[in-house]
Each structure stands twice: as C-alpha cells, then as structure tokens.
Amino acid sequence: MKFPLLLALLVGGASALHLSSETSDSKSPLMDENLPRDAEISGPEGEECPPGEELMPLEGEKEEGSGSEGVPGDEGAVSGQDVTDVDLQCPKEEDTTSLMGDSGCKTCRYLLVRRAECFDKAQSVCRRCYRGTLASIHSFSVNFGIQSAVRGINQGQVWIGGRIKGWGRCKRFRWVDGSSWNFAYWAAGQPCPGGGRCVTLCTQGGHWRLSHCVKRRPFICSY
C-alpha cells in the first residue's frame, strides 16, 4: 500500500520540477526588448528656441541668465500687455511736446510726454491716448532728433519702445510695435546684465540703456 503511494509522490515531484525549469527559460513580458526603456519614454529635457530666435547672452552674462530676470514688475512689462487701468488719464497738453519726424519719414510723428510713468503705463498711454506705441527707432537721424528734443528736460532718461522678450538663450530685443530691430545705439558697457529688461534713451548723448521696467520716467510715443 505504501509503495504505490510513494511512487506517485516521486512522479508528481519530478513533473513539477520539469515545469518550473521550462517556465524559467521563457522570457518575461516585462523584459520584452520591444518595450521602451526609461530613456526612450522620458520627456524632452527642455524647450528649444524656434529657428532664428537664439540670442547671444548679454555682455558679461552667463548662459543660465542673470538674476535680473526675477525682478518684480519686469516680467509683466516684457509681455507686451497693456495696463488694465480703467482710470487712466491722458496727459495734459502742457505736459507734452510734439517732435518732428525725420527726413526719411515725413508722416512719422513723435510726442514727448513729460509725465513720468512705468514702462507698461507709458505704453498704455501711447496706445489709448494717441493711438500709437512707445517709439521704435531705426536710424541715427531719428535717434539724434529725439535726443535733441528731450535734452532740455530735467530727467536723465526717457522710455522708448525697446524691451527684452523671452528668457535664457531665447532672449531677443524687440520693439513694442512689432517692427524690425535693425538699429541700436547702446551706451558703453550696455546692454548690461542685471540692468533690467526695458530700454531707455539718455537725454544727454542719446545713447540707450537697459532699465528696470517698473521705474517711472518720461517717455516718447510714436503715432
């Protein structure tokens, strides 16, 4: 009685051992070579600039960018959005001076507004009160004409319509009216990292400087 039972147990054990060996030799679905590896399914490392949008770092600036980008108020100014100020009041006539257009643009009109505003507010005043924008400058003659008209005011700098757009390696200088950035008249050492993201024109000499967009300054509209 005991011998047949023992024989049955031995045969059953050998069958189970053979089945286990076959299972271990087969491939696990979790290790299938056709499944993507971690490197293949990971997301992109970072956003790349569109073709032609790269800008070399500003003078003395490291690739990772300057600390000025985190200055409160500057980010909003470079977005190009107008100030949502329902109580915006247009400047009084005595606070403005009309400037002549240059010989290459008889229809161009410029306006000096002596009332000091931040960059965003200045752009909003130009748009809402004069149906224009902060001035874009594309030639030395225009730059010289504007500087000659503003050098008598008791302010060292005035806003024009230039700004830095984008971040990191994708930073570029742009005009708020969307025109081409084909002329610049920077002061020595400019554009300077940490100096801000909006562009001013110096009333003495006419050179340009970067400034923090939240500063209040007189400004030049073109319309």
UniProtKB/Swiss-Prot annotation:
Task: List the GO molecular function terms.
Answer: carbohydrate binding
**Matching SMART domains:** CLECT
Compartment list: Secreted
In its UniProt record, which GO terms are filed under biological process? defense response to bacterium; defense response to nematode; immune response; negative regulation of interleukin-10 production; negative regulation of macrophage cytokine production; positive regulation of interleukin-4 production
Domain C-type lectin residues, every copy: 124-223
Q: Which domain of life is it from?
A: Eukaryota
Keywords attached to this Swiss-Prot or TrEMBL record, sorted alphabetically, are: Antibiotic, Antimicrobial, Disulfide bond, Glycoprotein, Immunity, Lectin, Nitration, Proteoglycan, Secreted, Signal
Q: What modifications follow translation?
A: Nitrated.
Prodomain positions? 17-106
Its biological purpose is as follows:
Cytotoxin and helminthotoxin. MBP also induces non-cytolytic histamine release from basophils. It is involved in antiparasitic defense mechanisms and immune hypersensitivity reactions.
Q: What is this protein called?
A: Bone marrow proteoglycan
Q: Which gene encodes it?
A: Prg2
